[in-house]
Amino acid sequence: MTLDLPRRFPWPTLLSVAIHGAVVAGLLYTSVHQVIEKPSPSQPIEITMVAPADLEPPQAAQPVVEPVVEPEPEPEPEVVPEPPKEVPVVIHKPEPKPKPKPKPKPKPEKKVEPKREVKPAEPRPVSPFENNNTAPARTAPSTTAATAKPMTTAPSGPKALKRGDPSYPQRAQALRIEGDVRVKFDVTADGRVENIQILSAKPANMFERDVKTAMRKWRYEAGRPGTGLTMNIKFRLNGVKMD
C-alpha cells in the first residue's frame, strides 16, 4: 500500500499568500471596529461676542506707485528755410499826357457897314432973278426905315355846339343864395368835355355838383381839341351866366 504525500509548495508562493491574508485580516478588523465603536457625545458650541471697537480695521493696502517713465523727447523737425520770394518788378507806365484843349475858334466878326451920312444941302446963293417964296429943298428920306413886324392871329379855341346852363340848386334857390364857380376842363378830339376841375367856388359845396353834371353833357366841334380851358359860371337869382 502506498501513501500520497502532499506536494511541497515553493516558499515565494507561501510568502505571497501570507501577506495577502494579513492585509485582508487588517481591513476586516478596521471596518468592524468602526461599526461597533459608539460615537462620542457632542460637545457644546461656545460663542464669544467681540465688540466692533476691539476689531482693528484692516490696513488699507497702499497703492503701489509705479515709476513714471518720461517719454523720450521727440526730435524737433528741422526748419527748412523758405526760398526768398521774388519781388515783382513794377513797371511804371508813363502817364498819358493830357490832350491839349482845342483852341476856341474865333467867332467871325460881323462886318458893320458904315452908315452913309447924308450931308445937308449947301444953301445956294440967292439969285436976284429967283423968287424969295420958293419952297425949301426937300431932304432925302432916311435909309434906315423901320421894318414892320408881321401880325400873328391866335388860333381860335374849340367851338361849342351844345352848352346848356347848369341848373340852379333848389336849396340855394330856397335860401336865396347866389354864388360864383370857376372851372378848368379839357375838350377831346371828338368834342367831349373831360378832366373837369373846380378852381374856386363861393360858397363852397353848393353849386359844384350841378356844374359838373351840366358840363359832362356839353359838346364841342370835333377835330378842334383844347386843354386847360377855363370858364366862370355865375349863379344869380334872375338866371345863370357863363363867360
From Swiss-Prot:
Name the residues that span the membrane.
13-29
Q: Which SUPFAM superfamilies match?
A: TolA/TonB C-terminal domain (SSF74653)
Which PROSITE patterns does UniProt cross-reference here? TONB_CTD
Where is this protein localized, as stated in its record? Cell inner membrane
Show the segment(s) annotated as 4 X 2 AA tandem repeats of E-P.
Answer: 70-77
- Residues in compartment: Cytoplasmic: 1-12
Protein's UniProt keywords contain Membrane: yes
Q: Which stretches face the Periplasmic side?
A: 30-243
What keywords would UniProt list here? Cell inner membrane, Cell membrane, Membrane, Protein transport, Repeat, Signal-anchor, Transmembrane, Transmembrane helix, Transport
Region Disordered: which residues? 58-167
Start-end of Acidic residues biased regions: 69-79
* Keyword Membrane assigned: yes
The membrane topology term of the UniProt record is: Single-pass membrane protein
The ranges of the sequence repeats are 70-71, 72-73, 74-75, 76-77, 97-98, 99-100, 101-102, 103-104, 105-106, 107-108
What are the TonB C-terminal domain coordinates in residue numbering? 153-243
According to the record, the residues making up region (6 X 2 AA tandem repeats of K-P) are 97-108
Cite the InterPro entries for this sequence.
TonB, TonB-dependent_transducer, TonB/TolA_C, TonB_C, TonB_pro-rich
What is the role of the protein in this entry?
Answer: Interacts with outer membrane receptor proteins that carry out high-affinity binding and energy dependent uptake into the periplasmic space of specific substrates. It could act to transduce energy from the cytoplasmic membrane to specific energy-requiring processes in the outer membrane, resulting in the release into the periplasm of ligands bound by these outer membrane proteins.
Subunit structure and binding partners: Homodimer. Forms a complex with the accessory proteins ExbB and ExbD.
Q: What is this protein called?
A: Protein TonB
Species assigned in the record: Klebsiella aerogenes (strain ATCC 13048 / DSM 30053 / CCUG 1429 / JCM 1235 / KCTC 2190 / NBRC 13534 / NCIMB 10102 / NCTC 10006 / CDC 819-56) (Enterobacter aerogenes)
